[in-house]
């Protein structure tokens, strides 16, 4: 029997970016099965996503915030092999794929933008 984990996908807005911009998660909670690829999406409202750098972070139960990905294929230590970030300019959307989720990937995921 496969264990089901739950990844919570929330948006985070960084200071220094105009207040008219909003990052909106596609879903607040994304159910994920161990080993089955999962996709998190975050859209930008109020501005073109191509004008900003998009970053993804994970917060674990211990409240540790860890950098996962920044646009232009920059990954945090240990994330490059199992995570894939992308920007869909046409849809004004940031995408983070977890290629083979495991129990250690459980947590709250945040998308953020900066210039």
UniProtKB/Swiss-Prot annotation:
GO terms for cellular component: T cell receptor complex. Coiled coil: none annotated. The lineage of its organism: Eukaryota, Metazoa, Chordata, Craniata, Vertebrata. This is T cell receptor delta variable 2. It holds the Pfam family V-set. SUPFAM superfamilies: Immunoglobulin. Keywords: Adaptive immunity, Cell membrane, Disulfide bond, Immunity, Immunoglobulin domain, Innate immunity, Membrane, Receptor, Signal, T cell receptor. InterPro entries: Ig-like_dom (IPR007110), Ig-like_dom_sf (IPR036179), Ig-like_fold (IPR013783), Ig_V-set (IPR013106), TRG_var/const_region (IPR051117). V region of the variable domain of T cell receptor (TR) delta chain that participates in the antigen recognition. Gamma-delta TRs recognize a variety of self and foreign non-peptide antigens frequently expressed at the epithelial boundaries between the host and external environment, including endogenous lipids presented by MH-like protein CD1D and phosphoantigens presented by butyrophilin-like molecule BTN3A1. Upon antigen recognition induces rapid, innate-like immune responses involved in pathogen clearance and tissue repair. PROSITE patterns: IG_LIKE. The gene is TRDV2. It comes from Homo sapiens. Residues 1-19 form the signal peptide. Residues 25-115 form the Ig-like domain. GO terms for biological process: adaptive immune response; innate immune response. Disulfide bonds join 42-111.
């Amino acid at each position: 029997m496969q264990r089901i984990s739950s990844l919570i996908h929330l948006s985070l807005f960084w200071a220094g970016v105009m207040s008219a911009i909003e990052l909106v998660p596609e879903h607040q909670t994304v159910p994920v099965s161990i080993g089955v690829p999962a996709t998190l999406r975050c859209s930008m409202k109020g501005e073109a996503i191509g004008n900003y750098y998009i970053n993804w972070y994970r917060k674990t139960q211990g409240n540790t915030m860890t950098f996962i990905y920044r646009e232009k294929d920059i990954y945090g230590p240990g994330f490059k092999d199992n995570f894939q970030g992308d920007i869909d300019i046409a849809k004004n959307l940031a995408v983070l794929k977890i290629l083979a989720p495991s129990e250690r990937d459980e947590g709250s995921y945040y998308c953020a933008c900066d210039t």
